[in-house]
């Protein structure tokens, strides 16, 4: 048998000689440590991603509309019970909690369902994909938004039991409830409350305390819970007791929509390795990765009042050429513009911006400052786009 050789001087050529195997295997195999490409600069990454054209928009829209009754579906003679939105609403009324899975962002899907179907009570929406959302924040929003109770309770479980006791006292006189629980109770106690949790499997809610608390919250008869999941194996978060309390009925409803909002905070998708993402600051005190597109994406999910408050803040900072403003000054401006009537109301409106680290709240002495960690030029771009979207 002929031995294979080439014109080069490669010493690791294999032949029929048995000893050649051991000769070759003793050579050191070194692998370069520079196998990974360097992450893109966040600004460059945003520019490149903006060039990606959406695909299959007609098919996505048709899929989205297949979940609920549209004029086209009605003309085709489809019955209401054929649509998942109708089934979900029925399940909620039969004391099930609803868990929605499927590839693609489901924010618009769930928001549409709540807007069209859940009209017999208030709805509270929570963004489980926020890295710093805590179950305490969620419970506080429930007690403050529904009952006007502004107080902190020792533990999440105790807070949830406190909420449960409020709902159980529905037959109590309003004045007595105010004395007992300390809230305003301007609208009494609603018969139906819809609690929406986008990404209940989000990083900040994956701990046992959070899931135990949410499961306990789901046992309140007046509370109808709607949640979405995206992580593979998310249901491993719950033991048998939690599953019994949640009482899930599950729906697969893929949308194939991009996860723009969910990933707007994610450091792993912003480039820059460690320290990248929304919360990364430069030595000048500005957040080098907080881009206008990121802020505008967040603003799309907020109310008109929240957007107007943010515009007032931007206008003041641009005029003063600063990146911080006293909370008291912003409150006076917003009160005069009839955007808020109390400081607690302003704090509630600012919560979303603080959660996304678009606004940083800092105490200096006895004064509370609100800081937007971006350059004035970036503020001007954002304000200009906000005003153009209105005009």
From Swiss-Prot:
Q: Where is the composition biased (Polar residues)?
A: 22-38
Report the GO terms under cellular component: cytoplasm; nuclear origin of replication recognition complex; nucleus
Region of interest (Disordered), ranges? 1-43
A GO MF annotation of the entry reads: DNA replication origin binding
Which Pfam families does the protein's record reference? RecA-like_ORC2 (PF04084), WHD_ORC2 (PF24882)
Concerning InterPro entries, the annotation shows:
ORC2, RecA-like_ORC2, WHD_ORC2
Compartments reported by the entry: Nucleus
**What biological processes does GO assign it?**
DNA replication
Q: List UniProt keywords, sorted A-Z.
A: DNA replication, DNA-binding, Nucleus
Family (UniProt):
Belongs to the ORC2 family.
Q: What does this protein do?
A: Component of the origin recognition complex (ORC) that binds origins of replication. DNA-binding is ATP-dependent, however specific DNA sequences that define origins of replication have not been identified so far. ORC is required to assemble the pre-replication complex necessary to initiate DNA replication.
The record's subunit annotation is: ORC is composed of six subunits.
PANTHER family (alphabetical): ORIGIN RECOGNITION COMPLEX SUBUNIT 2
Q: What is this protein called?
A: Origin recognition complex subunit 2
Question: What gene codes for this chain?
Answer: orcB
